[in-house]
Amino acid sequence: MALSRRRFLQATGSLSVLGAMGAAASVPYSQGEDCPRLVPPSGSVDCHMHLYDSRVPAAPGATLLPPDASLDDYRQLQRRLGLRRMVIVTPSTYGTDNRVMLEGLARSGTDARGIAVVASTVSDEELARLHGAGVRGIRFNLSTGGQALDGIELLAARVNELGWHVQLATGPLLADIAPRLAALPGKVVIDHMGHVPQPEGVLSPAFKALDGLMQQGRTWVKLSGPYLRSKTGAPHFEDVGLVARRLISHYPQRLLWGSDWPHPTQSLQNKPDDAALLDTLLDWAPDDQVRQLILRDNPVDLYGFA
């Protein structure tokens, strides 16, 4: 199949970046070459990653248009981190077109679950088809030009009957929408630690809203994307670490970890070191049993891994 001009430019740009990272760098869209110091428990899950394929057109108005990032690319990261299971999240790039995510599920068997984006008019038959493919939740993305919360209450009720949850990338809106989320039936998953702003951190209205949702007992939080809000930066993200530690100390049984690979909000020259991201858990959650909850037990329960 001939390369389109867009795909050719993406490929050559990616090769240039990989060359800048060093000839031995083997994982696309990830800095560094070392394996993490943290050895994940067997059966651990990367609860947040995306796949991109430019053969599937982007949705009108999409603001994130990353280069292709394939399942084979991601499997290189899995080998580096010592992981096998993952949750494939349809990104805002494709709107309600879940084909790239579904292809990833079909190729991954029981090692993967999916999070779909659906229209408020989605049919029961389509939801059943998605469930059979391995989808276990729907996502609303308010941070990068994704869809608004129109119809979230009705959709939440419908997917709750399937045992699914509602996942949200809230951007800066968490404090404003928390009352609506608190009233939803079923489980809610918040991406990227609620995008709690820094340097306000645990004193911010966003964190207070997040803490209130967690106190209800039906909300899960992904310890992912620390670079999105950190002012102190890599590798330790000390400011975001204060938010993570507070959550871990109070709600260890409803936390998840995700890589956010291929880090679509970050430029090709500024991708994080995924091994270092995983190693933040050594500082944030020094107890082995707590890390086992975050990396394996919690996601196995939430996503229904066997």
Regions from the PLM with identified roles:
Residues 2-22, 27-43, 68, 72-85, ...:
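Mid-to-C-terminal alpha-helical segments outside catalytic/metal-binding sites
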Residues 27-162, 172, 238, 276:
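Mid-domain alpha/beta scaffold segments of enzyme catalytic cores
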Residues 48, 101, 159, 221, ...:
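Conserved, mostly hydrophobic/aromatic
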Residues 75, 102-103, 178, 211, ...:
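Active-site phosphate/pyrophosphate- and oxyanion-stabilizing loops and adjacent acidic/basic residues
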Residues 88-89, 117, 222, 258, ...:
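Short beta-strand segments
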Residues 93-94, 120-121, 144-148, 196-199, ...:
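Short, small-residue-enriched loops and turns at beta-alpha junctions
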Residues 149-257:
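Catalytic pocket-lining loop regions of alpha/beta-barrel enzymes
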